[in-house]
């Protein structure tokens, strides 16, 4: 399965909800989902009663699309979550939240996760002072994430910071925009992820069948 490079708004319509894949645009009047909040295609307006399996599948697909993760990697995250002690749901959420591209987005250095992935892939991001260009890199509590000094004048980064200055960031993070750096303080708790419109328990049930 290749990474989806098509129109992001179609993914929101397919899932029947806003996935906020385009960042600030999703909150504006220009958001296409507000005009056509139904699935694309000839039968997109038809409402179907979904089976339990279908609901579980949709939950999994939705979470994968929000974080931009492919099936093989997502299953690995689930298998790790099961092996860890504690709540499997919370462990699974922590696996995707610890992705470097997600942390860069959460810190406000990019307007969305796709843009954050590009920043990481192009070598603009440092972890504990060393360049890491792997978007799926797992950040650990205490890690310092920063923008490389030579990349701090890049317009998309400056725009993202200007947009996010003054906004509250996630409780498990700390950020200093003047220094272009932030800290991944701890793993988040499930109830703290307020922008994840997914029944994570349904995903656990899907994989545990």
Swiss-Prot record:
Disulfide bonds: none annotated. GO terms for biological process: ribosomal small subunit biogenesis; translation. The keyword Oxidoreductase does not apply. PROSITE patterns: S4 (PS50889). One of its GO terms (molecular function) is structural constituent of ribosome. Keywords: Ribonucleoprotein, Ribosomal protein, RNA-binding, rRNA-binding. One of its GO terms (cellular component) is small ribosomal subunit. Residues 98-166 form the S4 RNA-binding domain. PANTHER family: 30S 40S RIBOSOMAL PROTEIN (PTHR11831), SMALL RIBOSOMAL SUBUNIT PROTEIN US4M (PTHR11831:SF4). Part of the 30S ribosomal subunit. Contacts protein S5. The interaction surface between S4 and S5 is involved in control of translational fidelity. One of the primary rRNA binding proteins, it binds directly to 16S rRNA where it nucleates assembly of the body of the 30S subunit. Belongs to the universal ribosomal protein uS4 family. HAMAP family: Ribosomal_uS4_B (MF_01306_B). This is Small ribosomal subunit protein uS4. The gene is rpsD.
């Amino acid at each position: 399965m290749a990474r989806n490079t098509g129109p992001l708004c179609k993914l929101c319509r397919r899932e029947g909800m806003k996935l906020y894949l385009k960042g600030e645009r999703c909150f504006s009047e220009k958001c296409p989902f507000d005009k056509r909040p139904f699935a694309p295609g000839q039968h997109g307006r038809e409402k179907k009663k979904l089976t339990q399996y279908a609901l579980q599948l949709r939950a999994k697909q939705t979470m994968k699309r929000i974080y931009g993760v492919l099936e093989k990697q997502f299953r690995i995250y689930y298998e790790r979550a099961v092996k860890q002690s504690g709540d499997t749901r919370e462990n699974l959420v922590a696996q995707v939240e610890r992705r470097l591209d997600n942390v860069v987005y959460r810190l406000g250095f990019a307007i969305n996760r796709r843009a954050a992935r590009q920043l990481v892939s192009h070598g603009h991001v440092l972890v504990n002072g060393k360049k890491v260009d792997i978007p799926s890199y797992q950040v650990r509590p205490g890690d310092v994430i920063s923008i490389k000094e030579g990349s701090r004048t890049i317009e998309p980064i400056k725009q993202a910071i200007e947009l996010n200055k003054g906004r509250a960031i996630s409780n498990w993070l700390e950020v200093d925009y003047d220094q272009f750096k932030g800290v991944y303080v701890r793993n988040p708790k499930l109830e703290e992820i307020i922008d994840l419109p997914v029944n994570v328990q349904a995903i656990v049930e899907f994989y545990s069948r």
